[in-house]
């Protein structure tokens, strides 16, 4: 992807998603001032076509899944979302309408969860498509939840149903008879980041993980 096309794509699709500190996505980096009295929490996850999503998955769903798997990491730490950096590697020749749907999915969940894009990179690849996101959140000092806090004898509590996403993938691959637009498929495509629960568990749970 040449620089003129990259800049045009960013201006047309991603600039409307930009938040404070993103500098209109026109500079080399973003500027971020953490909220007073808060620690920053950072996590990163990537989605690769054929590994984490199927080639015919709706682009908006792929974008929302990308955001949500990262938000889930914040939830596990008891953090609140602040913003994110994202690298998109679209396959060469990806239709503009596909990218527009992808961005619309991001916009929908940005509004739902209260965060904005701060920067990133956009490239073209011969395939497979790959999308990487670094999420930034905040938590009061000393209140982050850790995996290492667990102790022998602790009770283990689970929110949601374990395995729904894996079953949903089998449905979409035709390996399990069920509605391809039903509950299991939706759980595979759209995980639910439990941000409110994670924040409520600060000072209550000794450990957490997503």
Residue ranges and their predicted role:
Residues 1-209:
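Helix-biased detector of long, well-ordered alpha-helical tracts
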